[in-house]
Curated annotation (Swiss-Prot):
KW Membrane (keyword) present: yes
Taxonomic lineage: Eukaryota, Viridiplantae, Streptophyta, Embryophyta, Tracheophyta
Protein name: ABC transporter G family member 21
Organism: Arabidopsis thaliana
Primary subcellular site in the record, as a coarse category: membrane
Family the UniProt entry places it in: Belongs to the ABC transporter superfamily. ABCG family. Eye pigment precursor importer (TC 3.A.1.204) subfamily.
Localization per record: Membrane
Gene encoding the protein: ABCG21
Record's bilayer topology term: Multi-pass membrane protein
Disordered as annotated region, ranges: 1-59
UniProt entry keywords in alphabetical sequence: ATP-binding, Membrane, Nucleotide-binding, Transmembrane, Transmembrane helix, Transport
Transmembrane regions listed in the UniProt entry: 429-449, 460-480, 512-532, 543-563, 576-596, 649-669
Amino acid sequence: MMPPNEQESSFPKTPSANRHETSPVQENRFSSPSHVNPCLDDDNDHDGPSHQSRQSSVLRQSLRPIILKFEELTYSIKSQTGKGSYWFGSQEPKPNRLVLKCVSGIVKPGELLAMLGPSGSGKTTLVTALAGRLQGKLSGTVSYNGEPFTSSVKRKTGFVTQDDVLYPHLTVMETLTYTALLRLPKELTRKEKLEQVEMVVSDLGLTRCCNSVIGGGLIRGISGGERKRVSIGQEMLVNPSLLLLDEPTSGLDSTTAARIVATLRSLARGGRTVVTTIHQPSSRLYRMFDKVLVLSEGCPIYSGDSGRVMEYFGSIGYQPGSSFVNPADFVLDLANGITSDTKQYDQIETNGRLDRLEEQNSVKQSLISSYKKNLYPPLKEEVSRTFPQDQTNARLRKKAITNRWPTSWWMQFSVLLKRGLKERSHESFSGLRIFMVMSVSLLSGLLWWHSRVAHLQDQVGLLFFFSIFWGFFPLFNAIFTFPQERPMLIKERSSGIYRLSSYYIARTVGDLPMELILPTIFVTITYWMGGLKPSLTTFIMTLMIVLYNVLVAQGVGLALGAILMDAKKAATLSSVLMLVFLLAGGYYIQHIPGFIAWLKYVSFSHYCYKLLVGVQYTWDEVYECGSGLHCSVMDYEGIKNLRIGNMMWDVLALAVMLLLYRVLAYLALRNL
């Protein structure tokens, strides 16, 4: 069948009329603490009507209806050229590929809009653009109550990605509690924030699993549907006016998917604007949508009331093959260019595939043309119309400029520190890590058992081992920090939850117990077993130098991980870097050629080694350098070439490295 001729449809030109008349300011079911979660302690119960009204007023104040408009959105990405094309000049760079092509729409408070389309049609790109998180240049306009995307709009917007980015070792209650402490306004007390967590847990049906860990990977935890509800709950805690979700039912069974969509519908009925992408909804799910936007290769072919989609396509000549067809399946077939009388795939021979593709492309072009003729003019008129929210939003936006962050810097730091310690408690002092450090320390102590100054080369080797081992170990632990945290950091910073500085300092401070206690145990065991100078002062100074070296090495690892954001690449570069520091440290090679001698001045192991030797030996100390001969320790070739003098310069050099590498890591994170 050839596509119907493009004709003026008798379909009414107001397809966006909502079949559910819902006031955008209905009472918010999350605004009154009517549900109590038994998972929390009795101390967190509410205190009475005055307390309830105060909390309710703050949360109701935060729920400001948002009318979302987007007009003629166009977005393109660069097409990658085949390998070798630039080397041999056989191919020219491919033109940019259009992902979105003149997409328009409007969603009002109380409405649930579903974006439908086959894979690669641009659904995720569109919802990401509407959430203000799309990288690159987007042409067209997106407005929120007539204003562009601002920090105040960001704080009123919830965005749930397709992949649930959650900490696997935290429980459901802990996850939502930390989110509430970070995202809810500082006008609420801690007790009131915990009560908001109770209500969200109860209303999303998470009471049964509130004390279960999230899980993920090899960690057994809650189900996929429960994980998705936790992700939605994180956004619902802030009582968003606009909620956007990317395929929230992906990978879920039909019952769980229906429960998720029913939750979204009830949230929309509370006066919110809800937009979601969905891949292949059942007829039961489809009936829950107020509006649908159907995309085909980035172009809209329908935008309007979900209950009138069959009527519209029938009016332009496209009828389903059966009267009992799922509307979602029907429109997805049309988006792929497949009509009811298109030949079945198994009936098409190889030589007929080209004709089939041409027919499908013809159907798509016909649908796009019909949309532009019949649906786009009234939609454009509605998008251009001014609503009351557009007139009042400027005043609210000016007021919100002074409150960019929901909580203070110290509150963000303390909550992030507690959350980080809780999440990483399983690895901070894991049995495997303790076993490794204890094994190496005991083995080192036995190998250097009660060494004497007479065996000066052995003692100097032990000091160099201190600097190298506690350079490698913290560096390789640190390079995985930010690559592993990257998805969570991007998600939370995109939502404007906290300052990067509070996260960065909390993350580095939280690692200090793990990074400093283990080397302290190591040095304590190895120092006394190895027969180094039996002086408490010298021991403490040796320990301080090793810990200083650990902090510098950790900074190098953090910088490499933050800059590369690829653990494998960072580990490879770290191996090469530490090998250079090892060779240029001053132990293996005392006479480095002048043209490459500068390497030792960028090696933190070199400065650590010099400091360890400097505090271990004095100028008047001697050792047995031959039969009956005693020589000054400082005249020993391996020590003499270190040129030990004023050790404050070495301390200063390490301080510069300590500061420089951590600043580099911070700047790299700002560019995420």
